[in-house]
Regions:
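Generic leucine side-chain signal with a strong bias for well-ordered alpha-helical environments
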Residues: 4, 39-40, 57, 72, ...
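DPxDG-like acidic metal-binding loop motif
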Residues: 61-92
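Residue-level signal for well-ordered, solvent-exposed loop/turn and beta-edge residues enriched
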Residues: 22, 68, 131-132
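Buried hydrophobic packing segments
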Residues: 43, 78-82, 99-103
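N-terminal beta-alpha supersecondary unit
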Residues: 1-64
Length: 164
């Protein structure tokens, strides 16, 4: 399956093309420009670099949140437009689950965190069971200090998308 993936949920924006389990091309931008300025040019570059034409894609995936409200709107509206024009299905991917999958080979619980501002983080707890990512604690926004008190440090990995 060939998929274009787009994430504009945080300060950085990313676009990637996957063919099966292989990341063919990836492009990440973390500069002062807004996602509305960078997302379409990034998508064009990553698709061109991958050598897989947009028409050959099987689906388009988009980070579905939590995250920056404006960034999520820009990403979802961009992907929705592409999906309509190309007649491709759209796959919403929970942002925290996407972060957790980066550590799918880890033992124990995975607790991704994203800065939600004002000493808050977006978080959830996941665990790999029989090759499947399982949500152990629902995604939520909470005080970073409450999270640190609540989690056990045994077999816990904390992937983040930036410093908190």
């Amino acid at each position: 399956m060939k998929i274009l993936g787009v994430d504009s949920s945080g300060l950085a924006a990313s676009a990637a093309v996957l063919s099966g389990d292989t990341v063919v091309a990836v492009f990440t931008v973390n500069n002062k420009k807004t996602h509305s300025q960078t997302l379409l040019p990034m998508i064009k570059e990553v698709v061109d670099f991958s050598g897989i034409p947009l028409e050959e894609l099987d689906a388009i995936a988009v980070a579905a949140g939590p995250g920056s409200f404006t960034g999520l709107r820009i990403g979802s509206s961009t992907v929705k437009g592409l999906g309509l024009v190309l007649d491709k299905p759209i796959i919403p991917v929970p942002t925290l689950e996407g972060l957790a999958y980066q550590l799918a080979e880890s033992d124990g619980f995975i607790c991704p965190i994203m800065d939600a501002r004002r000493n808050q983080v977006y978080t959830g707890v996941y665990e790999m069971r029989e090759g499947q990512m399982v949500e152990v604690m629902d995604q939520c926004a909470m005080d970073i200090h409450d999270l640190l008190k609540a989690v056990s440090y045994t077999h816990l990995t904390l992937p983040t998308n930036r410093e908190v």
